[in-house]
Amino acid sequence: MERHITKEVQIGNRWIGGNHPIAIQSMTNTKTEDVAATVAQIKQLTKAGCEIIRCAVPTQEAAAALTEIKKQITIPLVADIHFDYRLAIAAMEHGADKIRINPGNIGSRERVKAVVDVAKERRIPIRVGVNSGSLEKGLVEKYHGVTAEGIVESAMDKVKLIEDMGYDNLVISIKSSDVMMCVKAHELIAKQTDHPLHVGITEAGTLISGNIKSAIGLGLILNQGIGDTILSLIHI
């Protein structure tokens, strides 16, 4: 199996891309504002094999909590941001090693640029995330439905937006609950970019069926040498 070689990206004390090992990422389900509970869960996940942790940052209080959380953990922390660009900026100011955004739901170009400017200043990578469930109406119409091609075009449009702002310290994430659509999308995007790819299958169905879908999808994608970090919902 020949690996799809991508750019190297540093996330805290961890490197992904290039010839670095595929990093296992998981996510917390605590309220990030609850520092004690969040740290305890991250430590359990670390012990179980997690190498990068993602925390939701839905409020300014959650962003502020990252400072103390970071002091107590040993793995890189990714801040998951939706809608409010100010939370992305606050998360970076409070120590996030990477941020996950969808530029399409952050707002205007000016707001995206405000986030990019802080990331550039602090050399913090941005994970550009696109989900089939929130694909732009224009792309759904163009491809006559939600398709792998539409997902890839959406992701690459957002990558270009940030690159045009003079920043290319990026990781790309494309997801769908349709396993084969997700596999095809990864095959397509790997031919179009050398940015590292974060691989995960959107959760759907019961815990068991969701795990089966995830295992099949991840296996098919990784078997083609595609992927630099994977999302694993580790059970502790």
Residue ranges and their predicted role:
Residues 234-236:
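Conserved small/polar residues in nucleotide/adenosyl-binding loops
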Residues 198-203:
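Interdomain boundary/hinge elements
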Residues 79:
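Active-site flanking residues adjacent to catalytic metal/cofactor-binding acidic residues
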Residues 181, 207-208:
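Short acidic/glycine-rich loop or secondary-structure boundary segments that cap or lie
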Residues 1-2:
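Intrinsically disordered, low-complexity regulatory segments in eukaryotic proteins
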Residues 209-231:
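Active-site loop ensemble at the mouth of alpha/beta enzyme cores that anchors a bound cofactor
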Residues 6, 10-11, 16-23, 30-55, ...:
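Alpha/beta enzyme core
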